[in-house]
Amino acid sequence: MSDRPRRRRRPARVTAAVIVLPVLLAVLTGARTVPAAMTWQHLNPVELFTTIKLPALQASNRVSGVSTTVVRSTAQQVRLRLDVAPGERFFGLGERMGPLALNGQLLHNWSEDRAGRADAATSYSPTPFLLSSRGYGLLLDTTAMIQYDLRRADRVEITASTAELPVHLITGPDPAAVLQSHAKMVGLPPLPPRWGLGVWKCLIGGRDRVLADVRRLAEANVPLDAVWIYDAMDNGSGWGWPWQIHGTVPPGSYPDLPGLIEQLHGEGLAVLGYLNPFLVPGRRGFDEARERGYLVPTPAAPVFTEPWAEDDHRAYLDFTRPDAVAWWQDRVRHALGTVGFDGAMQDYGEGAPVDGIYASGQPGTVVHNAYPVRYAEAARQAAQAVKPGQTVLFARAGYSGSQASVTGRFTGDQHRSWDRHTGIGSVLPAMLSGSISGWPYWGPDIAGFFDGDGSRDVELWTRWTQLGALSPVMRDMLGAQADPIGVFSNDGTLATFAGYARLHQALMPYLHELAEQASRTGLPLIRPLWLAEPADPVAWTVEDAYLLGEDVLVAPVVTEGARSRPVYLPAGQWHDYWTGEVITGARWISARAPVQQIPLYVRTGANLALPLPATLGLPAG
């Protein structure tokens, strides 16, 4: 049947549209039911219903499939309604820092700079993909603003600010199949180079200090794969963080940046810098971009600018304008090809002005969410032209479609605190929800970025280092104040970082296998327990632990002073990494967690060669 409504009588003015999705799929652990139809109801004084048939779904095996319909409304708004079954849980919607299960929340599908905010409604990288524990996913093909209201127990209400909304219903025999179908629709993630899943150290302060720190790390036997030098300025490309670091330390001196990078390459290290999509008045490139019309204007200004970083302002490159993109890509190619960088933090991308006038002719409300996608695509294309398959551009912002252009993600700017919404407690929800949504390669800022009450807290730094080491990328961040606790604070912190770096290095062959799988299938490296055990009702409730692939279970400690924590082990036999004890799963246990140990379990029979705990050289405690 046509996806346009069959008119039985001329209705009154249509104000919105609602889709009701009744019993889309069988509950994974319950009775199998075949859905009959998708119903579209106009909200107007005349009741008008049109039934749109779904593809046949076989209850016997719940086969994979995608059913697509386009919902249209005469108003600039489409509303969808999902009926919710008892016990049904929802996940996804991009990187989120609140509870992993989205039930009970009001969320916005709008890319925003969270800047350490505590609300879960906002996201650096939202995506309009909702996964249900009943065995289906719903992907909305739009960059318009969407509100997801999951506060009611019996329904989910979705409001999209658009007159036309393609809706993709994705089904499969298990959640993994649904995630794989979604990944193939939005774009499979590219495979990063091997070093991209390694141990990175953030270094600043100029050539001499960087080289001295590299020597110190080598003397401590830290297995280093890459250094990230974000204050290394390159005027030709505009790369580098051009402001004071930590409020007191100015950008370092790099008189021969290509020479320094070549020297670090000779020591087996990849070198990353820093880029963003902005042009800053008074700095190189701004006048040329303005004269050529590459910067986004608004009705009120020939070039839109907004305050940024101390006394500076920033303007946005128009990524909908092909010649502007080509000009910007020349700068990226210069940084990678001529200067020699191997990648960069791909920062920002969330703030494209909604009143901007874009070359594509699209309104800013449509361009806003698409901006980080275009930004990522442009950077990826330039990198591939110079160093195909050899670079990592690790991004903060994203939207549906940027998954295909990003070889690394960080979780944004957390506070140095134990806070569950803005500090260390927000990291795992961000990585898990982002992984469900199609971004598999996560490396959070070890110890966070913004100042907080934990800036001098060694225990907090240690717990963050442990979580970073058991992430796809182990990378630290120096933060936003002059002297936070860090790798070089004392002999104990250096030994802790070195020990967990050795553990991460031992995991690298396994992580690379998982990354190859992700690039082929879209399955994430960091996984909720229910992805491996969808028939286990307890697994669907666990939000504070995760699986690396199928064989490693990690239970981070994110509570100050905790020396033990409950851990749910899925079915099977599990080895406690620290004690060697073999534990039968499908049950809760109480795990010991002294300060220097993160609860860590390896599935019996896993093909992993991990170092003995005693060889890590961790401090006592």
Residue ranges, per PLM feature:
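Terminal targeting segments of Actinobacterial cell-envelope proteins
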Residues: 1-9
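Secretory targeting and sorting signals
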Residues: 10-31
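Catalytic-domain carbohydrate-binding cleft regions of carbohydrate-active enzymes
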Residues: 34-607, 618
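An acidic, gly/pro-interrupted, aromatic-rich
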Residues: 610-611
